[in-house]
From Swiss-Prot:
This protein's name: tRNA-2-methylthio-N(6)-dimethylallyladenosine synthase
Highest classification ranks of the organism: Bacteria, Bacillati, Actinomycetota, Actinomycetes, Kineosporiales
Annotated segments matching region Disordered: 482-510
TRAM domain span: 400-470
Family to which this protein belongs: Belongs to the methylthiotransferase family. MiaB subfamily.
Iron-sulfur found in the keyword field: yes
C-alpha cells in the first residue's frame, strides 16, 4: 500500500495548503449521523470544513470548497432529481477549478453505482452505505490516478459509530445501535441498500453514550432502521427495553429518545421501559403508513389497524403526556377510497401530535413499483390534501391544549428562524415539541444546552409560545458549558494535508 500527501492542483509542491470540504446531507437521521462521520474522517485526514476555513478580506480565493460530498437518500424519486440537479450546478464550477473533487455516497450511490459517473462524468468518487470509512482513501486515489473511483461493498466494512466524528451539536447527539433492516416492505428500497440488520453490542452503545456525556452531551437519540428488533443478532428479544433502562443509570444523561420502531415488533416491555426510566422522553415516533388492513398487507407491513391502535392506547395509558408522531403514505398502488377513509379514521383515533405525510413514489427495484393499479396523480394529490388538512387540525388542537403547562425546555441553537425578530429563544420540550419562549427584561440569555423553565401561553399550528416570564428560570448545564467552550475555541488553523493511504483497490462494482 502506498501513502501520499496531496496538494491542491497547481499548488507549489513546497506549500502544503489544507483542502476545504463541505458535506451536503439529504434524507433521514441515519444520513445525518453518517455525515458527522464523513466530516470527522475528512478532518482526521487534514481537511478543513469550508464554512470555517475563512477567506481573507479582498482575497480572490475561490469561494467554493475543494471537496463537495453528497450524502444521498433513495427513498423518493425527487431524491434522484435533487442529486443530479446539484451535480449539474457544480459542473461549470469544477470546469473552472480542475483541482476540485466531488464525491457521492449514501443510499442513492449504493443503488445507482457507476451510473452516477456515466450521468455525471465530472464526479470523482462514488461510495456506498457499507464503506463510509473509505472516503479519504478514495478521494486520494482519484487524485493520484486521475480517474473516478467507484467502490460499492455488499456488506458493512466498519460500523459507522467507530469512525472519527465531527458532531454538529455539543449538547445533543445521535447514537447508532444498529444498521440495516430485516423487513421486506414492498415500497421500501432501504433494506436492499443498507443490508440486513447488524447490531452493536449493548456495552459498546453504553460506552459511547458515557463518553458523550463526559464531553457535555445532555441528550442522545438512539438510531436504527427498526430499533425494537435490536438484539436479533445476539439472540435477545428484550435487548432494546434493557438498553433503555440501562441509559437511566448514566449520570448526567438527562434525555433519551429513539427512532424508529416498527409496530409489528413493538412490545409492552418497551412501553414499560419508557414509562419506568425517567430520562426516556415522553415522545414516540410510530410509523403507520396506512390505516387500511388491505393496503398494509400489500405493503407487507406485518400488523393491522387494531394492533396499531392498541399500541397507541397502551402508550397513552402508561405515558399520558406522550406526544406520538408518525409516517403515512398516500396513494399506494391499489388504494381505494375506502382504504383511504380507513387511514383518516386511524389519524382521528390516534391523534398524532404531528405526521410526516408522503405521496407514494415508485422506486425501481421494489415490488410496489411493478404493482398494477397505480393511482392517478390527481387522486393522490386530493387525498394528500385531505390528510394534511386533518392532521394540521389535530396538531393545532393538541398544541392549544398545552396552554398553561409549565415545561422544561432544552435550549437549542438554530431552531427558531425568527428568533432575532421576535426576541424569543427556542428549544425542545420533553415531548419534543418546538417551543419559542420570551426572556424577562434584562435577563441573561441561556446558552444552547441550558434548560429553561417556561409556561406555555399559546399553542400555534406547529409550535408552542411561552411569553409569560413570571415563572421563568434557567438551569445552567454542562451541555451549555460545552457549547460555550466550542464558541470560544479559535478557528481551526490550516495545518496542511496529512498522509492518506491509497489503500488496496477492491473489485469495482459499477
Amino acid at each position: 500500500m502506498s501513502t501520499t500527501t496531496a496538494t491542491p492542483a497547481g499548488a507549489d509542491d513546497t506549500v502544503a495548503a489544507a483542502r476545504t470540504y463541505q458535506v451536503r446531507t439529504f434524507g433521514c437521521q441515519m444520513n445525518v449521523h453518517d455525515s458527522e462521520r464523513l466530516s470527522g474522517l475528512l478532518e482526521d485526514a487534514g481537511y478543513v470544513r469550508f464554512d470555517e476555513a475563512g477567506r481573507p478580506e479582498g482575497s480572490d480565493a475561490p469561494v467554493e470548497p475543494d471537496v463537495v460530498v453528497f450524502n444521498t437518500c433513495a427513498v423518493r424519486e425527487n431524491a434522484d432529481n435533487k442529486l443530479y440537479g446539484n451535480l449539474g450546478h457544480l459542473a461549470p464550477v469544477k470546469e473552472r477549478r480542475p483541482g476540485m473533487q466531488i464525491a457521492v455516497g449514501g443510499c442513492l450511490a449504493q443503488k445507482d453505482r457507476g451510473e452516477i459517473v456515466r450521468k455525471a462524468p465530472w464526479v470523482d468518487v462514488v461510495f456506498g452505505t457499507h464503506n463510509v470509512g473509505s472516503l479519504p482513501v478514495l478521494l486520494e486515489r482519484a487524485r493520484h490516478n486521475a480517474e473516478a473511483q467507484v467502490e460499492i461493498l455488499e456488506s458493512l466494512e466498519t460500523f459507522p459509530s467507530t469512525l472519527p466524528t465531527r458532531r454538529e451539536s455539543p449538547y445533543a447527539a445521535w447514537v447508532s445501535i444498529s444498521v440495516g433492516c430485516n423487513n421486506t416492505c414492498t415500497f421500501c428500497i432501504v433494506p436492499a441498500l443498507r443490508g440486513k440488520e447488524k447490531d452493536r453490542r449493548p456495552g459498546d452503545v453504553l460506552a459511547e453514550i458515557e463518553a458523550l456525556v463526559g464531553e457535555g452531551v445532555l441528550e442522545v437519540t438512539l438510531l436504527g432502521q427498526n430499533v425494537n428488533t435490536y438484539g436479533v443478532e445476539f439472540g435477545d428479544k428484550l435487548a432494546f427495553g434493557k438498553l433503555l433502562r440501562a441509559t437511566g443509570g448514566i449520570e448526567g444523561l438527562e434525555r433519551v429518545r429513539f427512532t424508529s420502531p416498527h409496530p409489528s415488533s413493538f412490545t409492552d416491555d418497551v412501553v414499560d421501559a419508557m414509562a419506568e426510566t425517567p430520562n426516556v422522553m415522553p415522545s414516540l415516533h410510530m410509523p403507520l403508513q396506512s390505516g387500511s388492513d388491505r393496503v398494509l398487507k400489500a405493503m407487507r407491513r406485518s400488523y393491522r389497524q387494531s394492533r396499531f391502535l392498541g399500541i397507541i392506547d397502551r402508550v397513552r395509558s402508561s405515558i399520558p403526556d406522550a406526544a406520538i408522531t408518525t409516517d403515512i403514505i398516500v396513494g399506494f398502488p391499489g388504494e381505494t377510497d375506502e382504504d383511504f377513509e380507513q387511514t383518516l379514521h386511524v389519524v382521528e383515533q390516534a391523534r398524532f401530535s404531528s405526521a410526516f405525510t408522503f405521496q407514494y413514489s415508485p422506486r425501481p427495484g421494489t415490488p410496489a413499483a411493478t404493482m398494477g393499479d397505480q393511482i392517478p396523480k390527481r387522486v393522490v394529490q386530493e387525498r394528500y390534501e385531505r390528510l394534511t388538512a386533518l392532521q394540521d387540525r389535530i396538531t393545532y388542537e393538541d398544541n392549544q391544549a398545552q396552554t398553561g403547562r409549565t415545561l422544561e425546555v432544552l435550549v437549542a441553537e438554530g431552531e427558531g428562524r425568527k428568533d432575532a425578530a421576535t426576541r424569543r429563544l427556542s428549544g425542545r420540550a420533553p415531548d419534543n415539541r418546538l417551543v419559542h419562549f420570551a426572556l424577562p427584561e434584562g435577563a441573561q440569555a441561556p446558552r444552547p444546552g441550558d434548560v429553561a423553565t417556561v409556561t406555555v401561553t399559546r399553542g400555534a399550528p406547529h409550535y408552542l409560545e411561552a411569553d409569560d416570564v413570571s415563572g421563568f428560570a434557567v438551569r445552567r448545564t454542562r451541555a451549555g458549558d460545552a457549547w460555550e467552550a466550542r464558541q470560544a475555541r479559535p478557528e481551526p488553523e490550516s495545518t496542511g494535508p496529512r498522509p492518506v493511504g491509497l489503500g488496496l483497490p477492491t473489485l469495482r462494482r459499477a
